[in-house]
Amino acid sequence: MKSLMSLTTIFLLISQFSVLADDNLIEKTCKQTPFYDLCVATLQNDSRSTSGNVPALGGIMVDAVAVKATELLHHIQELLKGTTDPKVKRSLKECASIYHAVRDADVPQATQAFAFGNYKFAEQAMNDAANEADTCQSKFVRSPLTVSNKNEHDLATVAASIAKFLL
């Protein structure tokens, strides 16, 4: 019984140190990015961040970019159904095309680049995704996507910063 309690205590201590190490890696990595709070929140909300390596954290950020691009595409489709203004429709369709490119080209390129250690390509792909969010925003006089475009831009910028940190 005494040895079981000792083993349990040791296990709990190791678990605590592991969590602290993961948080330290996240904090150290996120300090290298321009959006520290977004970086920390995104990584701490993903159980894969306990992997203990920076390239995996970059991959998690790329996945967050993909999720946001997909959410934006769904939101754009809903907005298209609800608008009759031809200028707004045209801009929304252009943004849909942009976010298809982010999801179907930039994200896979960055994912593969992080996986194979080609961090310059990961940085370029995520910088492209950030620029695409800005391009979408510029299509409108008053954008219905401002908050989402900014979030996508910031997530992609964090992912690009992590890739740059690895160079």
Where are these regions (language model features)?
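Folded extracytoplasmic luminal domains of secretory or organellar precursors
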Residues: A21-L167
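Terminal membrane/secretory targeting segments in land-plant proteins
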Residues: M1-N24
